Amino acid sequence: MIKFYFTTFHMKFPARLFSTSFTLNNTNIINEKDVKYITKNFLLENSNGFNLIKNIINSDETSEVKQNKIEVELNNIWHTEITDILQKKRSLGLDAIGSSILAKDFHNLIGDIENFINKGRTNKLPGVEYLKPSLIISIVLGKVIPFSLRHSDIFNQPTHSLFAEIGKILKYQSIFELHHRIGLIQNRVEEIKNYTEKKLVSEFNKLTKVLDEYKNTLKNLEELSGESIIKVGLGFTALLSETSEFYSLEEQIIAKNKSIRYIIPKNKLKTLINNITLMDTIELPMIIPPLEWKIDDNEKIIEYGGTILNNKHRIRPLRTKSVENSDANDMTYNKELVDAVNFKSKIPYTINLKILDFITRDEFINRDKKDNVIIYKHIHPDSALLGEYMKDRKNPKISEITTHNSKFLYHSSIISIAKLMKDVKEFYMTVFIDWRGRFYTSSCALNIQGGELARSLLLFKEGQKLNDIGLKALKIYTANAFGLDKRSKEERLDWVEQNLHKIIDIDNYEIWREADEPLLFLACALELKGYNEDPNFISHLPILMDATCNGLQHLSAMVNDFVLAEKVNLLKSTENDNPRDLYSEVIPHIKQEILEASKSYEHTNLERINVERCLVKRGLMTITYGATERGIYDQIVSKFFQKDEWNKTVGLHFVCIDSDIAPKDVVFTQKNILLLSKIIYNSLFKIHPNLNTLMVYFNSIVKVLCELDLPVNWVTPYGLVIQQKYNKFTKYNETTYVASKRYKLVLRKADTTSISKQKQIQAFIPNFVHSMDGSNIVLLINTIRDEGRKINFASIHDCFATHANDTAWLSWYVKQSFIRIYSDSSFLRRFHNYIQLRIQAKYGEDAHFDKDGVLTHVTIDNGTDIPDRIDIPKPLVVNKDNKIYKEILHSEYFIN
């Protein structure tokens, strides 16, 4: 019963908290310059943790019983492994010497924990003294070790979130232990309460006193404040940092009154990883269909879905909580949304055994065409030196090591889960949403929303014999994975036909290593090989189709911008046409702007910039998701430039690290790159003034609502009411002491009575567009369900997947759902009318309308004879010509 609470607090982390059990052998790190990797012992399948889950999966019990056991035992892996080390148990193939060293280390740590608790240095966590020290160690290491590997940007590690997570888990473990003890005592008290024997009366009195103490401790524990929980997490994290050689909690001063705190590996981390089943997970794929979510007539959740333990104990809500937009946590649901969640979670998957076998062969060449590692299979050999490298924040080894280790943790987790699931007949992914109604699949590395490795290892359980449509879709997807998605479909099909003999020669490493996505290309090649050998071949591979500049697709449809719609593939096109590429089409305008800017003496060097698609794509793509000029500047600098020198008289200078963008001997000032960022940012709005008009309208609406002290509310096309209200936060300091060392915490507290104007404006457009993404999926799922069509379906926000034979149907459903959202010119007017209603509901007669029923202004009493007047922006008038919606169904590249 205790263990299930481990899962509760992964929710605050991004969806990339990947996980499973894996154990490395103790061979030396292999030279990564060598093109071949030894993979036989990469993941030991006889480790204690691995076998714990594997034995449950392979047992003769019912699937429901096995699923329940998996959920319970999964969260105890770290404790199991540490207990095994303490008892000097180990799995075959593990490092005997290292295991003995670790046993001694852990015995010492237990003494440190006991001393820490006995001296009252528990940072005000009532009840923690009742927990086993080995459990406390397992909780801390189970969070800190993966954390130290996971985050590739070491200078932006969310350490406060880590401390909060550890503190919360310790809190709830203490609560469980107290409930357990209270239950035992109550049972005994009930047994002896009526006895008059002196000995039993004495026992009764002692037990009731202890019971009162436990209940009082429990009350204090349940009322523990957020900052106290963070202090607890920091305390135990710092203690193990001071007393172990696994990791180090460091603090670095970066400016006056400003410092960063980060966690880095220490000397014995590799030994630990080589002798333990590393866990970093919320859940594994389910071997039974996830339980359904259910709501009542008031649109409140009455039955939790997903995992069995989630259904029983309500651990994780359907909607992930938002700290910044806290009011969203109380928003209601609706039937259409909940039905869509239940539909998506019922799609069964299996492991692509051919891919799993291929990538774990001894002879697997683990390098792509650019000599980049495809799968990261070992911790970076210089990880223990990271602390030394951190003395110089500019040292490129920092990024090299942290990026490597982050990918290592991710890839290892994916392959470990695949190995666990490879013999499972079928498995499922739980589905959750955020407050905008956007869908997220399972907090597990192996899911359809994961990276290329995860997607290459997943197959739909229900396969089909390929028909003509399916074979064509598979060939196009193969070409896409190779990197030909910017060509016409006709050209892609021709390329596959011309190279088919090479593609299906699976042992021909050269062709798939040339692909942009080599593992997905390999998965496609295996399907084509199967069909080529037998036309009755049953295909299971999910075919992914990606929307083109999806944010701009939505915005262009809102304002009926025919020119922009054409550039983002909303209009009629054929298989002989190339898909339009907005990013490339903006380049001539940007070049012209740079040419004009370079006529100024201080910006002469800008003419040395070669404007490539890669330079502008990310900035243009993220404008609709809230990117600012400064944000684009940060993107460009981080990817293409490095600091050259700091001269206080002339400012910050950079050199380009990509010779395709600029010569490496040309020095650019910060002003140069800021101007370049401004040109990129403004290019979209200068070319498409309707887009600028829409952005100005949305921003002005949000500004007025902030002045009126109102959140932004809107209704999705399927009827869900969404509210955005970002609070202001105030910072305050807290101090705690661990092992005579002082730790200062800078914490934030939300002022729920105030609204952050800056955050409201910056976040609204991306949040609004994301809610339309989610709406598109809800509408298409409900259409599929209502029509009774049996179709495998998965989605990654604006990317859609189905069986090859069903791609034409899915494309049609996606387009139809998009048309339903924007099919008439009243979309923005409906949005405006709802805003008016919200204002009128609060201000009543102080909200003033014109003769046409349009809200013009609000008057606010300021204590004088003349009230304040706040003008309301007029509704945005858009072109009523619906040519866009007439053509979407005939677009070959709406999703590509």
Curated annotation (Swiss-Prot):
A biological process term (GO) from this entry: mitochondrial transcription
InterPro entries per record: DNA-dir_Rpol_C_phage-type, DNA-dir_Rpol_phage-type, DNA/RNA_pol_sf, RNA_POL_N_sf
Its EC number(s): 2.7.7.6
Active site, per annotation: 546, 617, 798
Major location (coarse): mitochondrion
Broad class of enzyme this protein falls into: transferase
Annotated compartments: Mitochondrion
Gene Ontology molecular function: DNA-directed RNA polymerase activity; mitochondrial promoter sequence-specific DNA binding
Domain of life: Eukaryota
Keyword Nucleotidyltransferase: yes
Entry keywords, A to Z: DNA-directed RNA polymerase, Mitochondrion, Nucleotidyltransferase, Plasmid, Transcription, Transferase
Residue ranges of the TM segments: none
Gene3D superfamilies with a match to the protein in the record: 1.10.287.280, 5' to 3' exonuclease, C-terminal subdomain, DNA-directed RNA polymerase, N-terminal domain
Reaction equations catalysed: RNA(n) + a ribonucleoside 5'-triphosphate = RNA(n+1) + diphosphate
Cellular component GO terms, alphabetical: mitochondrial DNA-directed RNA polymerase complex
Pfam families referenced in this protein's UniProt entry, alphabetically: RNA_pol
Family per record: Belongs to the phage and mitochondrial RNA polymerase family.
Protein task: DNA-dependent RNA polymerase catalyzes the transcription of DNA into RNA using the four ribonucleoside triphosphates as substrates.
Name listed for the protein in its UniProt record: Probable DNA-directed RNA polymerase
Organism: Neurospora crassa
